[in-house]
Amino acid sequence: NKYYKTNEVTWVDEAQMFKIIDRAETIEPLMIGSKAPNLVLRDTSNFIHNLYAINKDLTMLIFYDPDCGHCKEVVSDVKQNYDEWLNNGISIEVIAICVELDRDKWIEFINNYDTGDWINVAEFKTYVDGEFNRQNDPYVTPFPYVKQIYDINGTPKIYLLDKDKNILVNSIKGNIGVDQLSEIVENESKE
């Protein structure tokens, strides 16, 4: 990023340079070791959850679309591992963030994949005719902003955070398998 911003790169045209710099600025706050941006979203009971208020050694964020086949597979695998982690005394919270703005599909997904013991959040209330209305719900993170700050351009996307909400894993579309993710969770819980 520093070379592109200082015009030290001469082989890229201006339009491409803008795209490269813009992309670098988007992903920079999501690098491993960075503090994850806060999320404040509502669950199925309309209760507000604040990411920074979660008091667990590990927090896993799973961004998913209920119509995504790979999301279904990943959520099912994580759920199986989650139950084992809890049985082994691992202090972890899973926050499942639905990116599809269809409440019925969201609820059906939670029921079908038995994720009721996770924090299941999405944001529907703040939309009026497809537009975000801050006056409707001033307490939550606007969903287009959530997708932007977490760089959600495909699903599933998983972040694993430590107790201070620093990013340990940033995985898009399963580039880290659930087995590897489980190994990281188990290793981090021993530290």
What is the predicted function of each stretch?
Residues 50-51, 61, 69-74, 103-107, ...:
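Extended hydrophobic-aromatic, low-complexity segments
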Residues 47-78, 93-95:
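Short active-site neighborhood of thiol/selenol oxidoreductases, capturing the structured segment around
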Residues 35, 57, 153-155:
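Short, small/polar residue-rich loop motifs at catalytic or cofactor-binding pockets
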